[in-house]
Amino acid sequence: KGEKENLIEIAAYGEGALPHICANGTGIWYQDYGIRLDSPAHVYRGDVSSAVLLYDAEYIWIHDLEITNKDDIDRQSVAGKTSGEARSEIAERYSAPHKMDRTGVSVVAQNSGTLHEITLQSLMIHDVDGNVYNKHMNNGGIYMTALKPDNEEQTGIARYHGVTVEDCCVWNVSRWGIAVGYSYQHARFAGAQLQEEWFLKYGHENIVLRNNYVKNAGGDGITPMYALRPLVEHNISDSCATEM
């Protein structure tokens, strides 16, 4: 963790190409919301491969990196085949229910209460071959979640206060392009009308999604969730839901 006046910074320096974090299915961690989700069909726990994982981290600024998490075995398996055979096999592979959940950047709040000032800026995230079905697992380009704490009474409700995702290019990812905020507290936000106090206690505040470009996401493009008046401006989402 950083501090308000002393942020942790992870970024490129010097000249030349951006540093490239290439996960290729490594960086595996176990995600568990600790509670079933809003649909019994939605997966709520399992292994996830993330190129970058920020777990209970705050006061952190990550910028100017290239990030990928490819399924190279799938790509190599269709080499040399006819276009029809290749298309058929690719379709079968991307829709396989057992396909690994993958993320470019995963951010997780769980055992540290409210997390503050997390900034992702000028990241080039592409070729993240995740599972198109597991929509609320950390699955896609950038995905931030809040999981049930081990001891909520002691550590507090897991939530975010101050998230900025800005100037990022995200392409060829699945399932999500950019998602901020799916939470184990989802049941508290099921009504048609919600009080501001619920967001201040159980949801997220000061969420900014600005100047991002998402192209060819397998599912959703850019989504804030359970956030009080998030600022979403000057983003472009192009050719999304390509695997739906």
Which residues make up each language-model segment?
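Hydrophobic alpha-helical hairpins/lids featuring a short glycine-rich hinge
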Residues: A109-G113
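Extracellular beta-strand solenoid repeats
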Residues: E9-A11, H20, L53, W61, ...
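Short, well-ordered amphipathic alpha-helices
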Residues: K1, V105-S106, Q121-S122, I142-T145
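Right-handed parallel beta-helix
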Residues: L7, G14-G16, E58-N69, A91, ...
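Short glycine/acidic-rich loop motifs that flank beta-strands on beta-rich extracellular proteins
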Residues: G25, Q31, V48-A51, D71-V78, ...
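C-terminal extensions
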Residues: L115, M137-K148, Y160
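Short flexible/disordered coil segments
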Residues: T82-Y94, H98-G104, L194-E196, S239-C240, ...
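Right-handed parallel beta-helix/beta-spiral solenoid domain characteristic of secreted/periplasmic
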Residues: G2-H98, S122-N134
